[in-house]
C-alpha cells in the first residue's frame, strides 16, 4: 500500500449528502476482485448519460477537476452496502483524501486499509474548504497527515483528528497484510512454541 504523508493537490467540491457506495461504484461493476480499472466507473451514473457520454456538469468531468486528488463532500459519505470496491474506485481514479462532516463506519475503515485518508470535520470547516475547492485548479489544498493539518489556498490551517493506529498505518503504508508481515517473527515463534507444547496437534 502506498504511504500517505503529505498530499498537495486539487480539491473537487461535491456538496451532496448521503452519497452511498452504490453511487460511488454501481453494483454492475463489482464482478472483479482486482483493485485496478474501477476508476473509470467511479460515480458512473452521475458522470455519464445512458449513452455512455460524459455529463459535462458533473464535477469530475470539468477540466479543472479531472486531476483532483481530494474530494470535499457532504455528510454520511460512503453509506449503504459495505463494498470495498468503493475505496478501490476512488483510489484508482486518483482520490487519496476525502473530507466530509461524517462517514459511514465501514467505508471509513476501508479507506484506511486502502491508502485513502478520510477526514471528518465540522460542517462550517467543510463549507470553507468547499468554497476553496470551487476555485478549481487555481486553489490547491495541502493535507499533512503527520501534523494533522489541512492548509487552504489562503494560507489558513485547519486541524483534524485521526486515530493514532490508523495514522501509523497510513504513514507507513501498512494494510492488513503489511501489518501481519511485521509480526512474522513473533508468529513463527508462537507456532514453534505451540508445536513443542502440543506435538499431537
UniProtKB/Swiss-Prot annotation:
Heterodimer of LeuC and LeuD. CDD domains: IPMI_Swivel (cd01577). This is 3-isopropylmalate dehydratase small subunit. Catalyzes the isomerization between 2-isopropylmalate and 3-isopropylmalate, via the formation of 2-isopropylmaleate. The lineage of its organism: Bacteria, Pseudomonadati, Pseudomonadota, Alphaproteobacteria, Rhodobacterales. GO terms for biological process: L-leucine biosynthetic process. It is an enzyme of class 4 (lyase). InterPro entries: 3-IsopropMal_deHydase_ssu, Aconitase/3IPM_dehydase_swvl, AconitaseA/IPMdHydase_ssu_swvl, IPMI_Swivel, LeuD. SUPFAM superfamilies: LeuD/IlvD-like. Pathway: Amino-acid biosynthesis; L-leucine biosynthesis; L-leucine from 3-methyl-2-oxobutanoate: step 2/4. One of its GO terms (cellular component) is 3-isopropylmalate dehydratase complex.
Amino acid at each position: 500500500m502506498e504511504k500517505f504523508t503529505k498530499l498537495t493537490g486539487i480539491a473537487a467540491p461535491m456538496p451532496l449528502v448521503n452519497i452511498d457506495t452504490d453511487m460511488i461504484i454501481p453494483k454492475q461493476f463489482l464482478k472483479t476482485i482486482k483493485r485496478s480499472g474501477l476508476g473509470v466507473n467511479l460515480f458512473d451514473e452521475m458522470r455519464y448519460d445512458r449513452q455512455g457520454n460524459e455529463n459535462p456538469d458533473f464535477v469530475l468531468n470539468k477540466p479543472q477537476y479531472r486531476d483532483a486528488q481530494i474530494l470535499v463532500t457532504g455528510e454520511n459519505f460512503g453509506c449503504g452496502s459495505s463494498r470495498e470496491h468503493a475505496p478501490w474506485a476512488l483510489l484508482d481514479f486518483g482520490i487519496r483524501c476525502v473530507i466530509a462532516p461524517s462517514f459511514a463506519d465501514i467505508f471509513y475503515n476501508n479507506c484506511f486499509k486502502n491508502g485513502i485518508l478520510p477526514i471528518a470535520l465540522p460542517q462550517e470547516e467543510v463549507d470553507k474548504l468547499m468554497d476553496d475547492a470551487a476555485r478549481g485548479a487555481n486553489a490547491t489544498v495541502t493535507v499533512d497527515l503527520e501534523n494533522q493539518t489541512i492548509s487552504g489556498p489562503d494560507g489558513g490551517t485547519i486541524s483534524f483528528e485521526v486515530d493514532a493506529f490508523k495514522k501509523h498505518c497510513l504513514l507507513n503504508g501498512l494494510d492488513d497484510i503489511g501489518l501481519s508481515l511485521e509480526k512474522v517473527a513473533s508468529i513463527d515463534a508462537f507456532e514453534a512454541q505451540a508445536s513443542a507444547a502440543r506435538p499431537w496437534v
